[in-house]
Design a protein with these regions (language model features):
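Secretory-pathway glycan-assembly enzymes, especially type II membrane glycosyltransferases
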Residues: 1-110, 114-117
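N-terminal cationic-hydrophobic initiation segments that often serve targeting/anchoring roles
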Residues: 78, 121-125, 146, 184, ...
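Structural motif
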Residues: 83-84, 131, 189
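Catalytic donor nucleotide-activated moiety binding site of glycosyltransferases and closely related
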Residues: 87-95, 118-170
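Short amphipathic alpha-helical segments
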Residues: 99, 145-147, 204-205
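Donor nucleotide-activated moiety binding/catalytic core segment of transferases
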Residues: 110, 155-193
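Marks the mature luminal ectodomains of secretory-pathway proteins
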Residues: 115-116, 130, 155-156, 202, ...
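A donor-sugar binding/catalytic signature common to diverse glycosyltransferases
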Residues: 175-220
């Protein structure tokens, strides 16, 4: 065969860890030396970060529908670079989905949600002049956050699903993931909020590369 497809995934994906980057680069280099005309790699490893934005731009172009959504939400947030973002990746912690990882008991969920909301309150104290775009994979968390009616918090509408566990959904639902990525990319700083039981998602980091946003992590 002229084509070699491979999937290389890792749960160790800390952008600040030099040795993780070094080992990932060595593994990918070994695969890319295989004697095939085309090598198709699906991976969440760190690679070609400097070229990521330009390569992404070559492969993907937003449709008019997506561009209209981006323009609308940018206007609500004051324009590109005039807001920050905070991303939470709960998986099934709050009982929204069946995806893997632990699930908190019902009596543990609200205190945990409060802990996460407090991280947003503290972030606002540090940068009171900026709105905060909040994205998450839990409608329970987002609904609770919206009930607070915090004037500086912006949550985009749309059904929250886990793409890898969702089949035959509407176009609108799949569009939400693309919209989230582009909206994160236009923030001045992209924050991933995490602790030792949340999933250490690479999604916000990759989004930050698209338009040169600063990336940082907030530990609960």
């Amino acid at each position: 065969s002229c084509v070699y497809p491979c999937v290389i995934l890792t749960y160790h994906n800390n952008s600040r860890n030099f040795w993780q980057r070094f080992v990932q680069h060595a593994i990918l280099k070994r695969y890319l030396k295989k004697p095939f005309r085309q090598i198709h790699v699906y991976s969440n490893m760190f690679c070609s970060d400097k070229e990521y934005a330009s390569l992404f731009g070559e492969l993907f172009k937003p449709t008019k529908e997506l561009l209209n959504l981006i323009d609308y939400h940018l206007a609500q947030l004051g324009g590109a670079g005039n807001y920050v973002s905070a991303t939470f990746r709960f998986r099934q912690l709050l009982g929204d989905f069946k995806e893997g990882g632990e699930t908190l008991r019902e009596d543990e969920r609200m205190p945990y949600i409060e802990k996460c909301i407090n991280a947003i309150l503290k972030l606002h104290e540090q940068i009171p002049e900026k709105k905060i775009l909040v994205t998450a994979d839990s409608h329970t968390f987002l609904d609770t956050l919206k009930e607070r009616s915090l004037h500086y918090v912006y949550v985009m509408p749309g059904k929250v699903v886990h793409i890898g566990f969702t089949q035959n959904a509407s176009k609108k639902i799949y569009m939400k993931s693309f919209l989230d990525m582009y909206m994160l990319s236009y923030a001045s700083t992209v924050f991933l909020v995490r602790d030792n039981i949340m999933y250490h998602s690479g999604f916000p980091y990759r989004a930050s590369l698209l338009n040169g946003a600063r990336y940082d992590e907030i530990e609960l």
